[in-house]
């Protein structure tokens, strides 16, 4: 060390020498400045290397390295408070587990924060703007909502008499509670009485040092006994003073004022109304959700006021992944004392989290690529291999989406597996995570294939599904029998290795730990897989500090029961909790810049269709498909070997084959920008899941639907199935099929439903319009398409904004034998659809048509209203006829 310090002194001396020379020899100013600059840069580089690489660096950082400082009675081994209460009662059986939120506007901040909290905890809710008429509150003999929330308490207090009486009656009859937030105001109130209640408020106060009422029956998730020291956020707090035994404080705080005595009684910031005054239980908040403790108290209030219907589980499972083991530049890797600290911290956490082990993700190629001291750290990890759990990262830390050759990908995985075997690392965890989550989502099929073949992977995780932000919307899915779990971030990244360089400083990190984002992530998610990196465990060891601190803080302030399990068990438990998430929803990779960076460069969103012909069946979709294919600027998908021209991706098992499979039907072309790709699948129209799936992948696609008389469509479908040899259709008359009861044999009911359900046009269109704006929907009159396809196609081109327009008049001609228009070939002949199209069937019986008129009456009436709402200037003639008493001849 003496030699290095002397070298630094020599550098300083050199600077002096250069300066002297400039003075003595009267060198030009430019040369002097250049020389001084070069020496300065050299000194900086030398000093940087000296500080980072020398033994002195560990001494420097050890002085600043943060240590967990969370202290509370629970961690000191004091007597634990009684276990969390069970809020369940028989009253919960009369209400649905749903919250009704009254907001001032749809864009108000607190209302949005309430909704986000509910979404994060997967609590169903409905938002209503206060001041309007009340929504329907009951369904038969059951209440639709378990709790009512008023973003602004005044909106409840000032509600008109009729609605207030109606709302209060509902609350009393179904034992439904109310949560209200006192709004901030420009005018400061002192001792103002709440309208109609023996409760008084003081507003616009600054407060500090919050505490909870340990005797409150509301506290379940939240643990009392501690003090949240320091000023509370904002200077517009409301405190409550009661004049009735129905009120009991839930939380207190003190005035944050120099002229206010600190020994005075604390002030109630959250108060419970037990319902002894007017028969309705309430919880009133004197501040919004900026204070982290209020978020916990709101969740507990929902649980209590709903009689347990909205209670959250208190079990939380945690897994901490350490990516990039053996990967990293020199000076960022682990040394022996870092590994010892890792083991010591793991042991302390195990006392708080049963089963906890750090989960190490390794890339074997970079083993022993550090300094001599860091290589000893690598060795020490392997000496303690049994004390951790392990997973394969990637042999060379390369992103899987960069591999176009699956064989090459498998070979690299095999190298990592062989490294594991050579060094005694377990290879049977069934878990893996790729570098930067590449290939997990958006899916790179080669990764899933290689994972199965080499590692028999059964579970992975990613932060990218459906998107990184907002974190509350991260979900899981299953693809190729591999469970993909949501992965959480903790505020630490590969470059955050020193506390003094942490963005926002230590205060920012502590804010996340002590009630902030990291704390809330664990509170809101029953299963937490966290991403960290090897570099976070060296130098200042920020990951050790972060996780030990947040776990202790959770123990201090919540009744959560923390535990840990291997990834496979976490995956199984996750999909037991959320089975509805097993089916993926494929999004558009080009709508997320992060997704584009981990998507193969050989793929392009220009391969996706610009518009969809969605059906329904037997309305002329095949004819439209044929006519569109004539257009020189329009291209359809390649035909499917199983379903002919229809891919049927969004509504069937093909969806699980993934985006790569779908895009393979739209081969890339040099003229992508000028080409209009489309897909036609007539089964999409009435598919319950199709609109959501289609919108996730193709949010800007145009939708084309063709509507015919639903009665005629039903009859045509029946005849279609007869021609194709359906035994049910051949054994039952059309009238028997459409009038079949719900007790009829299942095959008969299935045929009935396929005849009748697609004709409920308004119902299906409304589902599409809940995802797509009306401007992206074009409705074609099926009769007009049949009688005047040229004009119909010209209107469609205008809707699609295809220029220049293609003149169909010289490419379509009416064929009297077929009874419809056909394509004109180069030889001036007509090329018509096959024998299965345009068949002539016996006329429908009058009794069947009359039945269908009655059956579709409400649906057709709704369709007329919908068409008018969409701005349609003309109502189709067939729709007018179906709504009259005229019997079809």
Locate the predicted segments by residue:
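Helical hinge/lid and interdomain linker segments adjacent to catalytic or ligand-binding clefts
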Residues: 100-188, 330, 358-360
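Metal-dependent polysaccharide deacetylase catalytic core of the NodB/CE4 family, i.e.
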Residues: 153, 172-174, 182-192, 326-330, ...
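The conserved 3'-phosphoadenosine-5'-phosphosulfate
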Residues: 766-857, 861, 873-889
